[in-house]
Amino acid sequence: MTSPSSARIHAQQLSLMLVTDSLACGERSLPEVVAAAVAGGVTCVQLREKLASGHVFLDRARALRQLLKPLGIPLIINDRIDIALAAQADGVHLGQTDMPVADARRILPPTMLLGWSVETPAQVEAANDLDVDYLGVSPVFATPTKTDTAPPWGLEGLSRARRLTVKPLV
């Protein structure tokens, strides 16, 4: 099945995605950091709050939604469909161990974006048959901010992923 992603998002809106959480902000507030990133050219924001309670995560998501909606910048919520729906976010991003894509798509409104993390070329190929709007190729390089990752793809791996799918890659 080919994703009707063109109806939900333009690839240009995914050209520079900020993936952040409140812990990455240091002394500054999350909205302050996100606003500065958008002013610097960020075209999409993914909120990851792995350590926050549901209440706190929802409050942060709503604050970012209020900031981003007037600017036309999509807000994607990491892992939590419930938070994405309650905050009226533009989408949700799921990893390999999260809810299956088909189940998520059944729950989500048809206009809501669905991103999926891929860690191997086989997963990229499998994604061609899934109703996802974009793929998160993770990680391209080693990172200290996320330690539970597969080995880095590197630039050659990223190039290979690009050849395996027409879906937008982030």
Located regions from the model:
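A short, flexible beta-alpha/helix-coil linker loop
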Residues: 141-143
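Conserved active-site loop/cleft motifs that coordinate metal ions or position small ligands
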Residues: 170
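Glycine/threonine-rich flexible loop motifs
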Residues: 145-147
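Conserved N-terminal beta1-alpha1 strand-loop-helix module at the mouth
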Residues: 1-101, 106-134, 150-156, 160-167
